[in-house]
Amino acid sequence: MTIRLAINGFGRIGRNVLRALYTGHYREQLQVVAINDLGDAAVNAHLFQYDSVHGHFPGEVEHDAESLRVMGDRIAVSAIRNPAELPWKSLGVDIVLECTGLFTSRDKAAAHLQAGAGKVLISAPGKDVEATVVYGVNHEVLRASHRIVSNASCTTNCLAPVAQVLHRELGIEHGLMTTIHAYTNDQNLSDVYHPDLYRARSATQSMIPTKTGAAEAVGLVLPELAGKLTGLAVRVPVINVSLVDLTVQVARDTSVDEVNRLLREASEGSPVLGYNTQPLVSVDFNHDPRSSIFDANHTKVSGRLVKAMAWYDNEWGFSNRMLDSALALAAARD
């Protein structure tokens, strides 16, 4: 049976989720029946079809005041500010993909349930949610009774697969992560007022240190790592693709060869973890659907101190995981 999805918020992630559904292997199992966004339908259709990062959408796209038509499929569109007023019940929505960045707490996301949706999957770290999921790492924790779930962040989705392997095989005692992260829409092209003084500065002109909860969130995904990891972000002037730089102290001495072997073996057959030995740079991973691509070229070891790096397309990889997690949530059993 096809799972009926609605997308709330048609920004970078919302649009890429829809693109991934139509250009990937998801259409036989998933159907987007509705999109709610406060923007004009004509503008949203144009932005969906033409993308500065991911190129032209390969299929036919049409629109009218009440719908977006993608490759012959009609998707109802609305512009309703209060999620509790959305027509999810009449549209038979099984799962809402909450992509606005606004309704990330359990209380706020519950408005979708009031509107008649079966479940909610949040495209961001969530507060007081029933589960935080990194597909390919802990999605087996999902249960049919879970109704409001977080898909974590793009950075946690990159970090968790690598940390899982290192902890399982070597025993992480503690560690620090830096994500060297592409700029995003919560920054500004030029200097402008922002309560975070770092993010008040031009995204295109500086490397900008800022905070992230991605490392701590790994403890929600892998409870055995709770309290062992922390980190920060450095936003850099590239439009897409980011890099996790992880340094951990492990329980025993190891070597570059062993660390690389462990990650290579873990990547074989993994739906989310890749392994790279080529001399590649960030642009080479643009539009890569994997969550985390470990780069064996940059592994460093000093006794029990290990540095590992992994690339991730912070838009496309995460958008694909939203669909994978939606499938896992729909299939979950108690």
From Swiss-Prot:
The keyword NADP does not apply. Keywords: Cytoplasm, Glycolysis, NAD, Nucleotide-binding, Oxidoreductase. SMART domains: Gp_dh_N. CDD domains: GAPDH_I_C (cd18126), GAPDH_I_N (cd05214). InterPro entries: GlycerAld/Erythrose_P_DH, GlycerAld_3-P_DH_AS, GlycerAld_3-P_DH_cat, GlycerAld_3-P_DH_NAD(P)-bd, Glyceraldehyde-3-P_DH_1, NAD(P)-bd_dom_sf. One of its GO terms (biological process) is glycolytic process. One of its GO terms (cellular component) is cytosol. The record marks H181 as: Activates thiol group during catalysis. Pathway: Carbohydrate degradation; glycolysis; pyruvate from D-glyceraldehyde 3-phosphate: step 1/5. It holds the Pfam family Gp_dh_N. Catalyzes the oxidative phosphorylation of glyceraldehyde 3-phosphate (G3P) to 1,3-bisphosphoglycerate (BPG) using the cofactor NAD. The first reaction step involves the formation of a hemiacetal intermediate between G3P and a cysteine residue, and this hemiacetal intermediate is then oxidized to a thioester, with concomitant reduction of NAD to NADH. The reduced NADH is then exchanged with the second NAD, and the thioester is attacked by a nucleophilic inorganic phosphate to produce BPG. Belongs to the glyceraldehyde-3-phosphate dehydrogenase family. Homotetramer. This is Glyceraldehyde-3-phosphate dehydrogenase. It comes from Pseudomonas aeruginosa (strain ATCC 15692 / DSM 22644 / CIP 104116 / JCM 14847 / LMG 12228 / 1C / PRS 101 / PAO1). The gene is gap.
